[in-house]
């Protein structure tokens, strides 16, 4: 039997103004997936889930309904069809969930990316990380009913990733400014991604679209120029944040607390309920995270978990 353990970090999709087209990875926390392979030339390849730790029994063990396993199934099918690599035997998956569910932290993408990087390594790395991203996106379909790359791509690749197009898929990595840090607070409530997506408007005013486009362009420019002040100005969302904010008790109070503590800017992480904020030093990031946590406690009587760390430049990796 051979086995490999993969890790993939939490990620933040949308990044305020970049709904479904922009995301970044954190250095922590992240999910761990161990993939074990037992060869059996008399048996066709099968994928099973042997153990899930840390989910409180919430995740399915059916390999076709769990993001960590379905992506490995799709990956093996791809290898057989497109690369002439066919396996026989059993791939057993053990998932250690370190990310909260329905948190806006890219939990499903983290599990999928960790499983894929482990399975790919186990088979001699026949695919590049970039080639693995579409499989992570298939995991997102299982998790929330739609394919999107704003968590899937950074969880696998690290850094900021801009999705220029979905058909064909065109991913553009953006290097992270050296002194950019993220504070993340996760209140102890759940906001299912499917619900957070369902309440969004299907059409928006042209004036809102123009403002959003301007902010996306400015954010990308700020990242490329390492212009921290511009990054902060660009963290404005006129499309999703106003609709989703009511799902998070005390959201605007927490956001203002982050700004008062020195944040460059911030918004809802993905579909929520987590909230992120950027700063230009680790010390500030810690202060901001604690301020957001305390505000949730005072304003909404909600306990929360916090993290403060750099943006991950690596994404998924083998442990």
From Swiss-Prot:
Top enzyme class: transferase
Entry superkingdom: Bacteria
One Gene Ontology term, aspect cellular component: cytoplasm
Principal cellular location given in the protein's record: cytoplasm
GO molecular function term, any single one: ATP binding
Pathway noted in the entry: Amino-acid biosynthesis; L-threonine biosynthesis; L-threonine from L-aspartate: step 4/5
UniProt xrefs under Pfam families: GHMP_kinases_C (PF08544), GHMP_kinases_N (PF00288)
EC number, UniProt record: 2.7.1.39
Presence of keyword Transferase: yes
Protein's cellular compartments: Cytoplasm
Task of the protein: Catalyzes the ATP-dependent phosphorylation of L-homoserine to L-homoserine phosphate.
Similarity comment: Belongs to the GHMP kinase family. Homoserine kinase subfamily.
Name of protein: Homoserine kinase
UniProt organism field: Chloroherpeton thalassium (strain ATCC 35110 / GB-78)
Gene for this chain: thrB
């Amino acid at each position: 039997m051979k086995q490999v353990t993969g890790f993939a970090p939490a990620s933040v999709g949308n990044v305020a103004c970049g709904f479904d087209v922009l995301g970044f990875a954190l250095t922590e926390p992240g999910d761990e997936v161990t993939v074990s392979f037992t060869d059996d030339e008399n048996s066709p390849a099968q994928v099973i889930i042997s153990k899930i730790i840390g989910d409180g029994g919430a995740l399915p063990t059916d390999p076709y309904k769990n993001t960590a396993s379905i992506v490995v199934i799709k990956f093996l099918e791809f290898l057989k069809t497109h690369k002439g690599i066919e396996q026989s035997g059993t791939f057993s998956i053990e998932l250690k969930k370190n990310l909260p569910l329905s948190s806006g932290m890219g939990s499903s993408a983290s599990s999928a990316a960790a499983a894929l990087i482990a399975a790919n390594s186990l088979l001699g790395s026949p695919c590049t990380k970039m080639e693995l991203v579409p499989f992570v996106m298939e995991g997102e379909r299982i998790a929330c009913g739609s394919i999107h790359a704003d968590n899937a791509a950074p969880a696998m690749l690290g850094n900021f990733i801009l999705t220029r197009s979905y058909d064909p898929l065109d991913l553009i990595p953006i290097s992270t400014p050296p002194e950019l840090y993220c504070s993340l607070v996760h209140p102890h409530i759940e906001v299912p991604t499917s619900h957070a997506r369902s309440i969004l408007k299907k059409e928006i005013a042209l004036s809102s679209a123009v403002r959003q486009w301007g902010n996306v362009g400015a954010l990308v420019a700020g990242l490329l120029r390492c212009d921290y002040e511009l990054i902060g100005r660009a963290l404005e969302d006129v499309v999703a944040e106003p609709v989703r904010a009511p799902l998070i008790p005390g959201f605007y109070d927490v956001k203002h607390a982050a700004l008062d503590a020195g944040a460059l800017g911030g918004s809802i992480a993905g579909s929520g309920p987590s909230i992120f904020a950027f700063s230009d030093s680790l010390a500030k990031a810690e202060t901001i995270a604690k301020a957001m946590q305390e505000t949730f406690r005072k304003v909404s009587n909600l306990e929360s978990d916090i993290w403060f760390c750099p943006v991950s430049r690596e994404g998924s990796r083998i442990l």
